[in-house]
Swiss-Prot record:
The gene is alnB. 2,4,6-octatrienoic acid is a particularly interesting compound because of its potential as a natural tanning agent for human skin. It is a promoter of melanogenesis and antioxidant defense in melanocytes in vitro and in vivo, topically and systemically. Pigmentation is a powerful protectant from UV damage and skin cancer, and octatrienoic acid is an attractive natural photoprotectant. The lineage of its organism: Eukaryota, Fungi, Dikarya, Ascomycota, Pezizomycotina. PANTHER family: ESTERASE ALNB, ESTERASE OVCA2. Its EC number is 3.1.2.-. This is Esterase alnB. The active site is at 93 (charge relay system), 226 (charge relay system), 255 (charge relay system). One of its GO terms (cellular component) is cytoplasm. InterPro entries: AB_hydrolase_fold, FSH-like_dom, LovG.
Length: 284
């Protein structure tokens, strides 16, 4: 029986994701088992949820500091030990970010992935769970560079070194997009570049900053009506995956999972492709 681990978005819950994925799961092979990983931290209600949706509203991490990201990754390990093994992993929004962080850090550490394939719905950038990632860039930020970064998005960052832009501008853009779009709480701790290489400093996984790639088939699905900056981040993280093993598509909605019949059919066609290609691999 194929088993799939599912991670929800910020400000929702396992039960809410189960409802969101209703049409998608209804179209699945009846033998598939969907297992939902619940976040452990209460937070504000996610943007776009109807007034009658009841909490608790949960997330996987309160901040994007490496230690908090590691705790989120630990939840996946604990679920694998308790209910695994799993064939695939599905992540929506923040859940996709956590899944990406987990898979990429395992690849960096030289461990084989515990999943054969992955699906990312409207995911956002992945953050490093290791506080040594990007240290050489953060530790050497000049006062001038810090002033430019603190002024984002009003300042011109074109003068920054390409790798500094990859790490720091992407971090600044992520927080700006997420906060202005209402995708995370206004009280979420942001990157403070004046701290330079402080262990609490968030560090984004950017394709330009590392050579490791997620080695399993991945499917990336965004909404045509989603926030354009958030879609840009979803596209960026595709660069963290093996380009030979990617399928990407767009559904007709916004920051959500596919729900119309046509969108669900297209999503499953991509997932079936990923499953078929995963069976040809020998990395386990």
């Amino acid at each position: 029986m194929p088993k799939i681990l599912c991670l929800h978005g910020y400000g929702t819950s396992a039960s809410i994701l189960q409802h969101q994925l209703g049409p998608f799961m209804a179209a699945a092979d009846p033998s598939y088992e969907f297992v939902f990983l619940e976040g452990e931290i209460e937070c504000q209600k996610a943007q776009g949820l109807g007034p009658f949706v009841k909490g608790p509203f949960l997330c996987y991490n309160e901040s994007f500091a490496p230690a908090d990201i590691q705790e989120s990754c630990d939840l996946i390990d604990e679920m694998i030990q308790a209910a695994g093994p799993f064939d695939g992993i599905i992540g929506f929004s923040q859940g996709g970010s956590v899944a990406l962080s987990y898979l990429l850090q395992r690849q960096i550490d030289g461990h084989p992935p515990p999943f054969r394939w992955a699906v990312f719905f409207s995911t956002v950038i992945a953050f490093a769970p290791n506080d040594t990632f990007g240290s050489n860039i953060l530790a050497n930020l000049t006062d001038h560079e810090i002033r430019l970064l603190d002024g984002y998005p009003a300042t011109d960052l074109s003068s920054l070194h390409p790798l500094t832009r990859a790490l720091c501008e992407t971090t600044a853009q992520t927080f700006y997009s997420a906060k202005t779009g209402g995708f995370i709480s206004p009280n979420t701790p942001i990157a403070e570049f004046s701290k330079r290489d402080d262990p609490s400093q968030p560090r984004v996984f950017h394709p330009a900053l590392l050579g490791d790639r997620i080695p399993i088939p991945t499917v990336h699905i965004t909404g045509r009506k989603d926030n354009s900056l958030m879609v840009g981040l979803s596209v960026l993280v595709q660069g963290l995956c093996d380009q030979r093993l990617i399928r990407s598509l767009t559904h007709s909605g916004g920051h959500n999972v596919p729900r119309s019949a046509d969108d669900v059919r297209a999503a499953w066609a991509a997932v079936d492709w990923a499953i078929q290609h995963s069976q040809k691999q020998h990395i386990w």
